[in-house]
A protein has these predicted regions:
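Active-site-proximal alpha-helix that buttresses catalytic centers in soluble enzyme cores
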Residues: 2-70, 99-104
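Phosphate-handling substructures
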Residues: 15-16, 59-117, 201
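Acidic, low-complexity terminal tails and accessory targeting/binding regions
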Residues: 2, 64, 75-87, 123-125, ...
């Protein structure tokens, strides 16, 4: 049957690799409120504090839904393919060691097997994954049959919502991307430079 995969990027963190900031906690609370009508069957999150805290705030709205932690929902660098990315991204990827890129590629491919497939159950599932920008970009780009590197530049706001549906009879369907209707403008695009964000939305 159909797996409805709800992807939420963690809230704003301070410092970047630290726990949620006050803004991040507010973003997570609003995301939880937004998701209340969804009949979630599971919640999964990565191991880092900013993701675990975001998931905990959201999960408070779903006391009967099981919550698990999985390194496949963690922060890592997906593959870029044998040909590599376009030139503007080469310098960015140089920030990561060869070992980080190899391990990230392994995790990203495993994540496709874990999350990007039809539900094995007889009925539909509604699964929330609280994760990071790179994994969301990877899952979106692969759902749209993009080249391996195309997760680069597919940016997700903190606590924004992306939904992908997987079934056994259709290609993956991107139902929504980077949906921030639950966030006021002041809470959107936190952490991004003005050069890569649209004004006032």
């Amino acid at each position: 049957m159909t797996r409805f995969l709800y992807l939420i990027r963690h809230g704003d963190a301070s410092p970047h690799d630290g726990p949620l900031s006050a803004i991040g906690r507010e973003q997570a609370q609003l995301a939880g409120t937004r998701l209340r009508p969804v009949p979630l069957t599971s919640i999964c999150h990565g191991p880092l504090p900013r993701v675990a805290q975001t998931a905990a705030i959201i999960a408070a709205n779903f006391p009967a839904v099981p919550v698990t932690v999985d390194e496949l929902a963690g922060d890592y660098v997906p593959p870029v393919g044998d040909a590599g990315p376009p030139a503007p991204y080469v310098g960015f990827l140089a920030n990561f060691t060869p070992a980080e890129r190899v391990r990230g590629s392994e995790l990203a491919r495993a994540a496709l097997g874990r999350f990007a497939r039809a539900a094995p159950e007889a009925g539909d599932t509604h699964e929330l994954v609280v994760t990071h920008n790179f994994l969301i970009g990877w899952l979106v780009s692969q759902a749209l049959a993009g080249p391996a590197w195309r997760w680069l530049g597919v940016n997700q706001m903190n606590a924004a919502l992306t939904v992908i549906a997987y079934s056994g009879t259709l290609p993956p369907r991107l139902l929504s991307f980077n949906d921030a209707a639950h966030l006021p403008v002041r809470l959107r695009w936190t952490g991004f430079p003005a050069t890569v964000t649209p004004p006032s939305i």
